From Swiss-Prot:
CDD domains according to UniProt: TLP-PA (cd09218)
Disulfide bridge positions per record: 31-237, 79-89, 94-100, 145-227, 150-210, 158-173, 177-186, 187-197
Keyword annotations of the record: Allergen, Disulfide bond, Pathogenesis-related protein, Plant defense, Signal, Stress response
Similarity remark: Belongs to the thaumatin family.
UniProt protein name: Pathogenesis-related thaumatin-like protein 3.5
Origin: domain of life: Eukaryota
Entry's Gene Ontology BP terms: defense response; response to abscisic acid
Tagged with keyword Hydrolase: no
Induction pattern: Weakly induced by abscisic acid (ABA).
Expression (tissue specificity): Strongly expressed in pollen grains. Also present at weak levels in seedling roots, in sapling stems and in developing male strobili.
Segment forming the signal sequence: 1-20
Role, per record: May be involved in disease resistance.
Cited Gene3D superfamilies: Thaumatin (2.60.110.10)
Length: 240
């Protein structure tokens, strides 16, 4: 489902021409625990932050992207890596390495997605599930530059059938598509259009808790935002 979201965003950039200059993404960790951000760039876009790095509590890291950059960011949790960068994460793992290169995060994972251009399109997506509170805030810019994200900790309200647990604790919340693999939850087959794929009771749990985040594949109207000539702050645990 994440690939569907990136493809949609990539098409959106055709509505605007490329702006000059660069965009700065500042990743901020307000969690009480270390987060290992992963980055995945779209076709033709440069890799940011070597694909992944460590972000300690209270730390921030700026990453500079070209004006046509597209891709996504996510947070990995409970990771352990050796000196060569090999290891694993309990949530959001990207192939047992610190630097994700061209591997996306293993669901369930909260995603911050971007396609930059004359108009930047951005969203926070829970289509692939949830693992870390996450927000995107535009810095400067003009347009519909509202903050997108999921501030709530969905692990505390995740339905039991979607819960991912470790040592008796809920550590992530799966999407209904991942949990049940049916067309009505995955928006595939006979349910593969906005007209035939409606919000489910599970996506409504996500939407109620996080009204500016994507809760299912066709949740565009209240979940995609546009801004021009802005930089962006991506915050893990924004309410902390």
């Amino acid at each position: 489902m994440a690939s569907l979201r990136l493809a949609t965003l990539a098409m959106m950039v055709l509505f605007g021409s490329c702006r000059a200059g660069a965009t700065v993404f500042t990743l901020v960790n307000k969690c009480s625990y270390t987060v290992w951000p992963g980055t995945l760039s779209g076709s033709g876009s440069s890799v940011l932050g070597e694909g992944g790095f460590t972000l300690a509590p209270g730390q921030s890291v700026p990453l500079t992207a070209s004006s046509r950059w597209s891709g996504r960011f996510w947070g990995r949790t409970d990771c352990s890596f050796d000196a060569s960068g090999k290891g694993s994460c309990i949530t959001g793992d990207c192939g047992n390495v610190l630097n994700c290169a061209q591997a996306g995060g293993t669901p369930p994972v909260s995603l911050a997605e971007f396609t930059l251009g004359d108009k930047d399109f951005y969203d926070v997506s829970l289509v692939d599930g949830y693992n870390v509170p996450l927000s995107i805030a535009a810095v400067g810019g003009t347009g519909d530059c509202r903050t997108a994200g999921c501030v709530s900790d969905l692990r505390t309200s995740c339905p039991a059938e979607l819960s991912v647990t470790s040592n008796g604790q809920v550590i992530a919340c799966k999407s209904a598509c991942a949990a049940f693999s049916t067309p009505e939850y995955c928006c595939t087959g006979d349910h593969g259009s906005p007209q035939t794929c409606s919000p489910s009771k599970y996506s409504q749990v996500f939407k109620s808790a996080c009204p500016t985040a994507y809760s299912y594949a066709y949740d565009d109207a209240t979940s995609t935002f546009t801004c021009s000539n802005a930089d962006y702050t991506i915050t893990f645990c924004p309410s902390s």
